[in-house]
Amino acid sequence: MGFRELIDGSREIDGRVSVNFDMRLESERTGNEPILFREITESPGHSAVMNILTRQRLCEAFEVQPGELIDILSWAMENPSEPILVDGANAPVFENTMDDTDLFSIPIPWHYSEDGGRYQSASIIIAQHGGLRNTSFHRQLVKG
């Protein structure tokens, strides 16, 4: 399931919202359903989504029941496969070509007033060291 498929069926918010608490409040107001925000005050020209990769949606993508998901993920961790490498010409991507990246220009929300600032709430880090690969999920504070 690709990203665009994940946002299909999301409730769309066309009015202006702020990354400063508005996105979280709107999510809570609607029971944390998938939401697509079309107009972000602090990030003109950008859209943002929330709540699109839930356990239920993962189960649907893998065509498994919720009770099976942990066992399947555990099996996959114990039985890793090598990635299939493809030629770059066959896998075009958007690349950052800015000299200085400004994370504050993209719609990263400030969820709670108690937080130290804006957080990427579902960052995926893939690290490799000494032949071992680790994938982990993090909340990452944007500092600057």
Task: Give short role names for the model-derived ranges.
Residues 1-144:
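Extended, highly charged
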